[in-house]
UniProtKB/Swiss-Prot annotation:
Source organism (scientific name): Acanthamoeba polyphaga mimivirus (APMV)
Coiled coil feature spans: 41-76
Domain of life: Viruses
UniProt protein name: Uncharacterized protein L421
Keyword line: Coiled coil
Length: 209
């Protein structure tokens, strides 16, 4: 039986091939499962992508709509402010520094603060103030805003052994809890020492005791 060794060899080879085939089949099944998951993921990602595109388009449309409304409001506000400025200035006649007065009127009308400037002054109120008091009022308001936004301010207490302390410029109490602190401008001229372009306030924090 000279063919017997060959038969055994081929049988062994078939067994080996069967094992290799099974291994490859397992690998193929695993890959197909991964591909199925990947396809699902791709489909989900495509859905998410399409939704994001739609959301972006809607947001862009909303943005354009809001920008248009804002532009209309700005134009309306500018018209009202300009009309108020013209009416007020016309009542005063010749004013030495018309540009500064214009800026101060606009600042008082357009700048809101719940405590310092809870409502804009009326045209009649501005006319009653007069040019100099309008500038003083605007400069004082602006200086107080700078004080609130530039803290903490360092000062010495005139009680408790002249303790060094800080005040944030906003609250009614300093760092140590005392209510003695206030912003002193007694040595300053609000008419000339500050403008609406200054970055730092005039005056200093001071103990009131």
């Amino acid at each position: 039986m000279e063919n017997l060794p060959k038969i055994n060899h081929f049988r062994d080879l078939i067994k080996t091939l069967n094992i290799q085939i099974k291994n490859k089949q397992h690998g193929l099944i695993s890959i197909e499962k991964q591909l199925s998951v990947a396809i699902d993921n791709v489909e989900n990602l495509c859905l998410i992508r399409n939704k994001l595109k739609t959301d972006i388009e809607n947001l862009l449309e909303n943005k354009i709509d809001v920008e248009n409304k804002l532009l209309v409001l700005r134009n309306q506000t500018e018209y009202i402010v300009s009309s108020t400025v013209k009416t007020v200035v016309k009542k005063f006649g010749v004013v030495p520094d018309i540009n500064r007065l214009d800026q101060c009127i606009r600042y008082l009308i357009m700048t809101f603060h719940p405590i310092l400037n809870p409502r804009k002054p009326t045209t009649d109120e501005l006319i009653k103030l007069g040019p100099e008091k309008i500038i003083l009022k605007a400069h004082e308001f602006y200086n107080n805003i700078l004080v609130m936004n530039s803290g903490p301010h360092v000062f010495f207490h005139t009680h408790d052994n002249y303790q060094l302390c800080e005040w944030d410029g906003k609250s009614t109490k300093c760092k140590c809890g005392s209510t003695c602190v206030f912003w002193c401008i007694e040595e300053c001229n609000l008419l000339t020492d500050i403008s609406l372009s200054c970055k730092n306030p005039i005056g200093y924090a001071k103990c009131g005791f």
